[in-house]
Amino acid sequence: IEHIMDKITLHDGDLSDSSSLIRIINIVQPDEIYNLAAQSHVQVSFDVPEYSGDVDALGVLRILEACRILGLTKKTKVYQASTSELYGKVEEVPQRETTPFHPYSPYAVAKQYGFWIVKEYREAYNMFCCSGILFNHESERRGENFVTRKITLAAGRIAEGIQDHLELGNMDSLRDWGYAKDYVECMWMIMQHETPEDFVIATGEQHTVRDFTEKAFAANGITIRWEGTGLEEKGYDAETGKMLVCVNPEWFRPTDVDNLWGDPTKAKTVLGWNPQKTTYAELVEIMAKHDRQLAKQEKAMKAAL
């Protein structure tokens, strides 16, 4: 955010500390609050379930309650970044606003509380607060511990000869991946709508981890040839025959959600949002090109040592 530091003011706060939230909201008197803060990694939530619950569930409550205590229920709108992980072991495909929730991780359970407490404050206090049920949103800024970024980083580094291979978990997991920049536009549109409502934010397309991997390598000029199934599946460079991708059971989650596919019809019809502004293929290309440049820089730095 260095390029916009002259346009913003940063305040120190923490979703686990209600006093800091009350202080900041009282100082700023905001028209809109976008709560994008969370412990947002599903796998990590199994390692730190209490922390995930404190931040992802009670953190939402603390923001809403701060607005209520400060008398801002009529002034301040609140957007809560919810998640497709709420659907968990899905009960219908694709998933829409009316699909029942079946959370399947500590992260998803905490996020479900966040979703329902937003709805409760909306109805109990007539607040303009709403949730966007975000399906996987990716970009070149995605954390390196998330699978899409792990893939594009590895593809770039392998293409530059500074990484040997890539290890992944469930190659058959199905996800609805969109570009974060487009999804933020939808968040803003939700907050400009005349009434507070909850919306699914998704592309309406579904792809496997395998397909994302294949396209990321293709963006780096490498064609992957797949052999084997399950834990024995491997991806080889079609030109050289070198093994570049393999499955490691350590990357499987204790409980895995394997079929997420969002239906953005409501956001399209009610808000006029375009979920295909950036296509899936363009998203992978953007991330792959960015991380190839990082790999080139890393290679140059190593050569200079």
Identify the residue ranges that each predicted region occupies:
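N-terminal Rossmann-like NAD(P)+-binding domain of SDR-like oxidoreductases, especially those catalyzing
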Residues: 1-137, 181, 187, 191, ...
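C-terminal substrate-binding subdomain of Rossmann-fold SDR/epimerase-dehydratase oxidoreductases
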Residues: 13-16, 142-305
